[in-house]
Amino acid sequence: MTNWRDHILKEFTPRVERLTVVADPDGLLLEEKILEGIRDRGFELLTFDDHIEFRYVYESRFRSHWDRGDQTDLVVVLRSGADDLASLPYDLFHAGRKLSFNLGDIFPNLSYPVVATLNRGYLDVLYDAQKRHSPGNLGENATKEFILRHVFEIAPELIKQPSDLLRVLLRLHYQGQQIPDVLTARLIQLLRKSNHFDDWPLETITLDREAFYGFLQERWPIFLSHMTAQGASIAEDDRGVYNLAVKGPANIPFDHHDIRGYVESIFLEGLLQPASLENKDVLYKTWMRIGVKTHTAENKSFKLAKLVSNLDSSVPKDDAKYTDWFHFARGWAEMIVISSDGEVHLHEEVNNNIKNLKGLVDAAFTKWIVKRYAGLINLPPVPPVMLHHLTRYLARHLVNDSISKVALLVVDGLSLDQWLIIREELALQKTDYYFHDSMVFGWVPSTTPISRQAIFAGKPPIFFPDSIYSTDKEPMFWAQFWTDQGFMPGEVVYVKGLGDGSLDDLSETLSHPQARIAGLVIDKVDKIMHGMELGTAGMHNQVRQWAQQPYLRSLIEMLLDRGFHIFLTSDHGNIEAEGCGRPAEGVVADLRGERVRIYPNVSLRA
């Protein structure tokens, strides 16, 4: 076998059995390339999670076609062991070919519970390492260390200096490596044994990305002050002089050759913020310039040129993981913010590079979407990958994390670049706010009735075909989802039309002792967008002005005061575009909005 997927894909030969039932306790068939391989072989895949939802799709999309004599190959996936296949409905169990796959069969010499914690995207590297090194039967700790070394390229015994540790943590957090907690705990345990990092908050900065960036943010000004005073690297430790929120050594070797490249990138993408410095001219011609606060248009243009260059060399490939696009999107959004800043003079070369890059990204993303998007719907909801996963993700938090209350704020029409502006303004108003960013894919087409309803229903749009032109059923979908999770109707709140005005009515609603789950729609950004005539720069200006007003901060503070954990998302974004006027099409289009037309068939669309 050349890779682990061959163990699975060799079992799928089209036109043999129209129904294949698979016991898949480890979710192997839901891995991106497995899904792609199954689809390329002509199979459709359907997970058996909810009896009613499954029966609806099965009867409408497959059973009815089979009854007409049509040939379609269907794979039904049960997320449990082979012994549970008998729990499937009678017609499925007796009509389908039965298969079973699990990680233990693919990695027989490694600890099954440890391997099961690993993100399926890392199984390629692990499979290659298993073939190359042929380990004997490894126990739990030995398996953890094998994975750390050969999958994540972390050799704990070689981490002896601060620069060694920082290199590992920067790669972990900046590249978005998904190391399971059990492996992180083992790494910390081994580092503690070495006694090299007794004063480092390893548990905090290893497990929490935002805490790690906060750790670096506090120490960057200290580094700059030493560099301007001494012109050399820091050797002494003067942590007692500084009041640091994240405990640990005050002096960090940002200028180490293994660290510097990461530091430049995280400043370029806005993950760290430049620091104020009195004698900043000393650093003007050094690499540290990128992390020094200045309001000069020249410095912003310098940052933009470097960011565009970085993005141009890192556009995800055709076979990229969805997480690669998430990572790319953060830098892309930062580029949009800077390039739309009225103070920045776009040199002709940089402007042309941005235009070329936009064309390159549009083509690459479109190609990737055509190839991979259809499989995203089947991925597990934790971590969420698509908008309809969010509601199930919240439910997991309520059940597993002992969170008593959650509030989901859906900012209609908010794009990622505009979120960066809102986040910046909120951080200026409340320095103790703690943000943890992640991304999900919206639904295509990303209209509000389709994408936003998927959030509140917790289901793909196929389950609400009669309401994809309206959002009127959102309150019902939201209440129904939580009722199905075992919550009482009085515990669930849905309010839309937020964004300005008084919060008194909402405050009274959320003050009810039963209120535990709040779905709140903020439509202010969408209203700004629909009235905008000044492009991206105008959007950024008005979104910033709105964020500077007290409304959003007051809403967040009110929710926090009432014990809510806050999750903020968007149903879709927006981009600047040139319109084509208002086509006079009569009743040809089913939906004739100002920015979208929906047609009943391909012929009329053409």
Q: What residues fall within each predicted segment?
A:
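…; additionally, a secondary subgroup of soluble metalloenzymes is captured
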Residues: 1-406, 413-566, 570-606
